[in-house]
Amino acid sequence: MPKFRNSEEQAAWQMAEALSEKGFSCMRQAEEAAENFRSGKMQMRRNFKARGLSEVDADIRWSGMTAARKALADNGWYMSQASMYNEAAAAQYAKALYLKNADEA
């Protein structure tokens, strides 16, 4: 834990930490959505292979399914949320650093 010179610096640091944690949480959810898409695609390929159909047919069928669209939409949503939270955290870290340097001057 860093040493703080004033309460504003500490508040900025704590806000940055909280935003960073939310960003990581969103990233984990995005990874779960991507894994759901991948596992669904593989399952569809196995099912089609068992029936003697091609992987291309399985991919076409999978891409049209609601579960695939939801997984892709969830991935995109959570990735954008993670990006937003990480950018906000970076701004708060910069603010804390600025406040620290301003106190030293």
Where are these regions (language model features)?
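Heptad-repeat coiled-coil alpha-helices
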Residues: E32, S39, R46, M84, ...
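Charged, low-complexity interaction regions
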Residues: F4-R5, C26-M27, A50-D57, W77-M79
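Arg/Lys-rich, low-complexity, intrinsically disordered basic segments
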Residues: P2, M42, F48, L72-A73
